[in-house]
Amino acid sequence: GVEHAILHLLYSRFFMQALSHQNNLFNIKEPFSGLFTQGMVCHETYKDENNNWVSPDELITKDGKKILRDSGMNVKIGPSESMSKSKKNTIDPEKIIKDYGADSVRLFILSDSPPEKDVQWSDEGINSSYKFLQKLWVLNQKIIQEIEANHPPSQNNNLDKITNKFIKDITQNIENFSYNKIIANLHETYTGLNKIILNKIEKEKLVENYKKILIVISPIIPHFSNECLEMINIKENLLWPKVEEKFLFEENIKFIIQFNGKTRKIIVSKKNTTESLLLNKIKEDNKLNEYLNNKNIQKKIFIPNKLINIITN
C-alpha cells in the first residue's frame, strides 16, 4: 500500500544521503524523480457464527445467502478490505489463472479503476473480462479469414484511422499510467474493427494494421497477442509502432445546430466550415429553416468545428 511504498522511499533517500556525504564523487541525493503508489486489491470479508475469519473458497451460495460448504453454517459478510492472509479474504491466483487465464486477470485488474485507486475483486468482474477475451478471439478468427481471402487493393482508409488512433491513445495512456483508459480504448477499437472487417480490405494493409494493434496490446494481454501474431506469421520487427498523423486528420466532423440555446440537429460538414457556409446549409434544410421563418436573427454564436447557436425573436 501507500504507507509501505513511502517507507521504501524513505529508506532509499536515507541511503542516498549517506552515500553522497561519504563520497565526494557521488552527488545524487534524490534516488527518484517521483513516486507513484498503486492501490490495493480488495475483497469482501467473511466471518462464521463463531466470529472466525473464513476464506471465499470455503463458501457456497444457497438461496441467495453465503454459507460454509462443509458445515452449512451461516456466514456474516463484512466490508471489502485489502486482501490479507489474516482476514482470509484472498483468492488463489493459480486457481483463477487455471479457470480464466492470465490475460483475463490482467484485463480485469487494469479495467476496474485507475492504478492509484483500490481494485474491488469480484467474480462478475473477472468473468466479464474473460468473456471480452472470447469476443476478441472471435474477431481474430474473422480477421484471419479476411486475410486468407486476399482482397484486391482499395482506397478505403478507415482501418488506418482506427489503428493510428488506437496507437496514439494507448501510447499516451501508458505514459500517463492511465491503464484503465487503455481497456476503454481496447473496447472502442474492438467495436470499430467489428464494423469494418467485412469491407474487403486488401491483405497487405490488413496484416500490417493488425500487426500494429497486436503489438500495442501485448503489454496488456501478452498471451493473446503472441498467439495471434503467430497466426499471421509475424515473428520479427516487433518494435512499438509510430503514429502516422495523416490518418488522424478528420475531413468531416459533426456540427451542433442550436436555436435559442436548444439543440435541434447535428449535421456533418467538412472541417473548418465557415459560419456563412454553415448558415447556408441550415437554410437548405427544410426542418431547420422552419426555425428561421418569420423571425429575425438577433445574434449568432459560432464556435469553429463545434457548433452554431442562432438567437432569434
What are these regions (language model features)?
Residues 7, 88-89, 208-209:
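Short, glycine/acidic-rich beta->alpha junctions
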Residues 9, 13-23:
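Alpha-helical support elements that line or immediately flank enzyme active sites
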Residues 10, 24-31, 95-268, 302-304:
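Helix-rich, typically C-terminal accessory recognition domains appended to large enzymatic cores
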Residues 2-8:
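Acyl activation and transfer enzymes in specialized metabolism, enriched
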Residues 147, 255-313:
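NTP/phosphate- and nucleic-acid-binding module
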